[in-house]
Amino acid sequence: MRQLLFPVAALFLNACTTTPVPPVDPQQAWVDFTTPTPGSKLVMAQRLDGKNLDDGRFFQFPPGHHELMVRFDFEVPAGGGLGGLSQMMYRTCFMTLEYDHFRAGQHYVLEGRSLAFTPNIRLYDSARQLLAEERSVNCL
């Protein structure tokens, strides 16, 4: 039984990593994610206008006002050891951002950053202009 478990698990993991991202719809706004902070693990779409999403790799939606909720996982010092910084643990935060002027065909980037225990997200347009920052942060 154990010998069968590993190949089946590998098959499911492979399916998750090879699912293609759908093509960009020019009639909608598109938001990708990035995290330049060392120790940042994940920025993922969680909700759009209060509704859970099926695919957390991106946001794609009609133009106008929208509220985006993202999940952001990043490393923080866990204490212990010399100076209390030898062990790390992951912190998970859910952050909400609102923006009124999403435009059709425009590509946006949502950037997750952390400074120690303090996370933030910023929304940029394709010219790297800052458009919005998070309005609420809830961490576990």
Regions from the language model: what does each represent?
Residues 1-16:
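Sec-dependent bacterial lipoprotein signal peptides
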Residues 16-140:
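Short loop/turn and low-complexity linker motifs enriched in small/turn-promoting residues
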